[in-house]
Amino acid sequence: MESKREYDYILPGRAESYWLATVPEPSYPALKGDIRVDIAIIGGGIAGLTTAYLLKEAGFSSIAVIEAGRILKGVTGHTTAKVTSQHSLIYDRLLSKFGKRQAQQYAESNQAALEKIASIVASKKIDCDFVRKPSYVYAGSEDSTNKIQNEAQTARNLGLPASFEENLPLTFKTYGAVRFNNQAQFHPVKYLNALAEEIHEDGCHIFENTRALKIEGEEPVTITTDKGTIRARKVVQATHYPIHDRPGLFFQRLYQSRSYVLGVRIRDPFPDGMFINAEEPVRSLRSQSTDKGELILVSGEGHRTGEEEHEISRYQNLEKWVRSVYSVDSIDYRWSSQDAISIDHIPYIGRQTSGNDSIFLATGFKKWGMTTGTVAAMIITDMIRGKYNPWEEVYDPSRFKPVESAKTLLSQAVEATKGFVGDRILPTHKEASQIGPEECAILQNRGGE
């Protein structure tokens, strides 16, 4: 019998995601032997399953989704499941850093992803607790009010349903908020289990407990797994971290962040909406209807993975805070999630490398994967169909230029690798004379270094 961890004796609540605890677990077979398909998708979360669903809806009839463990047991099953184009305070930063065109692409794509989910729920009549609600980013201190006002103005100028609100119906003091109307929340596992049922029939397959080990070649691409080999015309990597990392060096261009969730019953009435503050530490709130009444999901306390020795304190901080602002009846659930974040905080979606139409990538969703994972599915589906997508530029995995990115990349590499480099960094040029203007390169000296 497995012994309990130290914090099981200290922290209240069931150590399991509410989403996974409240839905029967489906079962799909493992791969047996070698197969050939048109499209192979690695990863059984929202990005992988939505991509498979959209491709099948577009007429592709030979698709395989492979998952190393069980579908939806990773990040997707441990989300807070806000379906919104409001990703904290992002639009003012996007406008200043990337310009209006790319900020517009990000805004339009995530708003479209929200509506795509709503459309699928309606057309397939999926019972997944989908409900429209306003979403708020609030200022927890006066120092953040100007940022909130600027964000509201920028988001509104980009065509988003944004407004500035001076007062919120919360039990604690706030200093203004940016409100997005007509956003949504849902039960992600109910939603994606329904999509999985649509996928796994008529020549399309989901294979669980099938780990991808290696990806090689181009059309056909060969995926070596621990259960057999898959050959496919196109491959989509919708994993938390790319299996096929080189070229691209994504181990240097992504870092991991862990955050924590409590499922809380309170005696106070909870207002209509989803809420998150603009400061650190993050405090995020949303409600979920259950058979036992309303459950409030309280989340935050994010930190870089590996930098916290005592994770128990993160749960305790959330518990202390929620008890300070609400009358708590019970804490029924607790869980944590680990997210991948890119160095510029925009996901990598599209062709893994420019010019390669065989291998596609979706990663770095920065804790907003319900919409960005759906954006990934929409963009990659269009690319595989040979159809232009108006949002692909802002998410392009090859968007970094050496001179502009070198300082950030080097700094990120130190944090991400922690001494782990191995053979991933290979020489790119033989001689220094081969390096062009505004380029950087990796050289091998005569001593082999």
Q: What residue ranges belong to the model's regions?
A:
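Extreme N-terminal leader/targeting segments of oxidoreductases
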Residues: 1-39, 57-61
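Glycine-rich active-site loop/strand segments that organize a redox cofactor
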Residues: 74, 78-109
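N-terminal pre-ligand scaffold of iron-sulfur
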Residues: 394-449
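C-terminal catalytic lobe of FAD-dependent flavoproteins
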Residues: 279-280, 308-309, 313-317, 324-408
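N-terminal Rossmann-like FAD-binding beta1-loop-alpha1 element of flavoenzymes
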Residues: 37-65
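Flavin (FAD/FMN) cofactor-binding and adjacent substrate-gating region
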Residues: 2-21, 89-95, 119-194
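Helical element adjacent to the flavin cofactor pocket in flavoenzyme catalytic cores
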Residues: 146, 154-156, 178-234
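Flavin-dependent oxidoreductases
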Residues: 215-287, 419
